């Protein structure tokens, strides 16, 4: 199975006058390709998937696949939902469009049991022939995908190959590595990208990568090549921007930073998300002065 790993950005979704800004979206994807990312993740948490219509969600996937076609850059399409039927529909669409894999967040709000989570992921994975990456972010979903359930999925469902682990817990990373050594683990928390990579992680799905794809690409590739000191140096150099980009709920600060850096022509969110406070906006702007944001 040709899986999706390495340096990835969880793409923002730009809006203009309340609608999807497809022109800017394509430009953002092209910029990611220029700066050495291995794969892109449209319509995840950072892409405001929860407030996109189904047609907008699918359009984002279609655009990402189209722009990446022939570049060698893979697309891991967001296909999560708290409805298994909806997740299957999105997964099938992603496969039809030519996505290289799908990223599926644990069902949120309805808080299924571990057996329910197993049956959900099994149904989604078996509906398609492309790889599926699990996505665990209990702070947002209200449910934790337990290690025993992950192990069962990995053993019983052939196209489930890895996890975006966004619990922020290194203890969890070590536990997964110890109990499921052949399972692909990717950091879903920019603050611990380097520690995850240094503990047999095989990639990251980054928010910072939207703004500084060259840095995230270098951080990941140096680690995977065994140059851990250089990877750690890059990781530590991102400390200030990481603090700034999570001063409010993601993706509020990253969209503000992209706008302030001139990478998007507008700063728009879908309600209930709104712009950062004036204080936080100033802090983001000041922090950007310490970094070179390449075109």
Curated annotation (Swiss-Prot):
HAMAP family: DapA (MF_00418). It is an enzyme of class 4 (lyase). Keywords: Amino-acid biosynthesis, Cytoplasm, Diaminopimelate biosynthesis, Lyase, Lysine biosynthesis, Schiff base. GO terms for molecular function: 4-hydroxy-tetrahydrodipicolinate synthase activity. This is 4-hydroxy-tetrahydrodipicolinate synthase. GO terms for biological process: diaminopimelate biosynthetic process; lysine biosynthetic process via diaminopimelate. NCBIfam families: dapA. It comes from Wolinella succinogenes (strain ATCC 29543 / DSM 1740 / CCUG 13145 / JCM 31913 / LMG 7466 / NCTC 11488 / FDC 602W) (Vibrio succinogenes). The record marks 45, 109 as: Part of a proton relay during catalysis. Pfam families: DHDPS. InterPro entries: Aldolase_TIM, DapA, DapA-like, Schiff_base-form_aldolases_AS, Schiff_base-form_aldolases_CS. One of its GO terms (cellular component) is cytosol. Its EC number is 4.3.3.7. It catalyses: L-aspartate 4-semialdehyde + pyruvate = (2S,4S)-4-hydroxy-2,3,4,5-tetrahydrodipicolinate + H2O + H(+). Pathway: Amino-acid biosynthesis; L-lysine biosynthesis via DAP pathway; (S)-tetrahydrodipicolinate from L-aspartate: step 3/4. It is found in: Cytoplasm. Catalyzes the condensation of (S)-aspartate-beta-semialdehyde [(S)-ASA] and pyruvate to 4-hydroxy-tetrahydrodipicolinate (HTPA).
């Amino acid at each position: 199975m040709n899986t999706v790993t390495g340096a990835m950005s969880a793409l923002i979704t730009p809006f203009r006058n309340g609608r999807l800004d497809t022109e800017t979206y394509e430009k953002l994807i092209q910029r990611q390709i220029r700066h050495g990312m291995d794969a892109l993740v449209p319509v995840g948490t950072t892409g405001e998937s929860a407030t996109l219509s189904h047609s907008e969600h699918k359009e984002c996937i279609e655009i990402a696949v189209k722009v990446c076609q022939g570049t060698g850059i893979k697309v891991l399409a967001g296909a999560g939902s708290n409805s298994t039927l909806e997740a299957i529909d999105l997964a099938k669409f992603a496969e039809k469009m030519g996505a290289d894999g799908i990223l599926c967040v644990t069902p949120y709000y309805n808080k299924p049991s571990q057996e329910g989570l197993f049956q959900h992921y099994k149904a989604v994975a078996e509906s398609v022939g492309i790889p599926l990456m699990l996505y665990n972010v209990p702070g947002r979903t209200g449910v934790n995908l337990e290690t025993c359930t992950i192990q069962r999925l990995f053993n019983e469902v052939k196209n489930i190959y890895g996890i975006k682990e966004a619990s922020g817990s290194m203890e969890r990373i070590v536990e997964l590595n110890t109990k499921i050594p052949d399972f692909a683990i990717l950091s879903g928390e920019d603050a611990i990208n380097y520690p995850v990579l240094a503990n047999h992680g095989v990639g990251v799905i980054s928010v910072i990568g939207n703004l500084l794809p060259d840095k995230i690409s270098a951080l990941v590739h140096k680690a995977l090549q065994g140059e851990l000191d250089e990877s750690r140096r890059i990781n530590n150099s991102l400390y200030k921007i990481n603090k700034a980009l999570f001063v409010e709920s993601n993706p509020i600060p990253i969209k503000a930073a992209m706008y302030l850096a001139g990478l998007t022509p507008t700063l728009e969110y879908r309600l209930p998300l709104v712009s950062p406070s004036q204080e936080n906006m100033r802090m983001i702007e000041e922090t950007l002065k310490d970094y070179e944001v390449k075109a």
